[in-house]
């Protein structure tokens, strides 16, 4: 939330957070305290219904277990209107490994959740989990680890087509690392049923916590404002590239995230 709220706000959209948990620090740190809010989510939703609350957009991110995924589906079904823009970031794993929260039940509930969305933002690992589950994800990951850059990009395009067909959504597959002529790049693939679009930039540094949250927040606010997905992805890539560069220059620990605050003003649509 500390990444999402400032991004959504500076883009001119009011953020109304429904916490699933309050943490002392993100889960990449060796020690953290987590106060689970699952049993209080219904109370908050009930109060919002009394207010006749109907958001213009709904964005779901990290969910700690299958019960929270159920609550997220319930939230969408309670508050979504015909014109409500829904984005789901199906947080389950990265780099061919599931996160500790992962269970097959969570994955099945996440499949239900993404069917409520207009746009989803999985990385390759999460795309494979949505399509195949844990066992086949690992098999596929071993296979793609041997691919050249061109083979990997072709494979991701196939996965993107499968996602859009199976879940009837627009899928943005994020954080695809590859090499071309000795240079390192990171790409994002926008997958619609009729077309696919690549947005690519040179890669700098390693993996930083919170970049996926920032990326999805820019897309979700853009959806509410009627911005084309490709334009929002390019905006997110430009923003993240600058924050990552500063984090590398300053030697910021990956668990601290990137240095994005300086560039928040660039997300605002100044009139």
Give the label of every model feature segment.
Residues 196-210:
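Short pre-catalytic strand/loop immediately N-terminal to key active-site residues, enriched for Gly-Thr
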Residues 206-229, 233:
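Short, small-residue alpha-helix embedded
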Residues 1-88, 92-100, 261-268:
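Conserved N-terminal subdomain of the carbohydrate kinase-like
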Residues 57-61, 87-95, 121-129, 173-174, ...:
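Short beta-strands and strand-loop turn motifs
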Residues 101-197:
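Conserved phosphate/ATP/ADP-binding segment of small-molecule kinases
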Residues 230-271:
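Charged C-terminal helix
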């Amino acid at each position: 939330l500390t990444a999402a709220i400032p991004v959504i706000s500076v883009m001119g959209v009011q953020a109304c957070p429904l916490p699933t948990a309050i943490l002392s620090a993100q889960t990449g740190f060796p020690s953290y305290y987590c106060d689970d809010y699952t049993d209080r989510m219904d109370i908050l939703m009930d109060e919002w219904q009394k207010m006749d609350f109907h958001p213009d957009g709904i964005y779901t991110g990290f969910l700690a277990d299958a019960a929270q995924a159920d609550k997220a589906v319930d939230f969408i079904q309670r508050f979504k209107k015909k014109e409500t823009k829904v984005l789901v970031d199906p947080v389950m794993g990265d780099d061919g490994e599931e996160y500790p929260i992962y269970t097959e039940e969570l994955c099945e509930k996440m499949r239900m959740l993404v069917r409520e969305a207009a746009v989803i933002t999985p990385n390759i690992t999460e795309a494979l989990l949505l399509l195949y589950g844990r066992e086949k994800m690992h098999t596929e990951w071993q296979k793609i680890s041997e691919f050249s850059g061109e083979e990997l990009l072709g494979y991701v395009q196939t996965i993107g087509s499968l996602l859009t067909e199976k879940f009837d959504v627009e899928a943005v597959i994020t954080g695809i690392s590859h090499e071309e002529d000795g240079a390192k790049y990171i790409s994002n693939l926008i997958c619609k049923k009729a077309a696919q679009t690549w947005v690519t930039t040179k890669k700098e540094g390693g993996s930083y916590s919170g970049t996926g949250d920032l990326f999805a927040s820019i897309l979700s606010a853009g959806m509410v404002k009627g911005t084309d997905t490709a334009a929002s992805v390019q905006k997110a890539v430009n923003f993240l590239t600058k924050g990552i560069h500063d984090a590398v220059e300053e030697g910021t620990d990956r668990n601290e995230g990137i240095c994005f605050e300086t560039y928040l003003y660039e997300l605002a649509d100044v009139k």
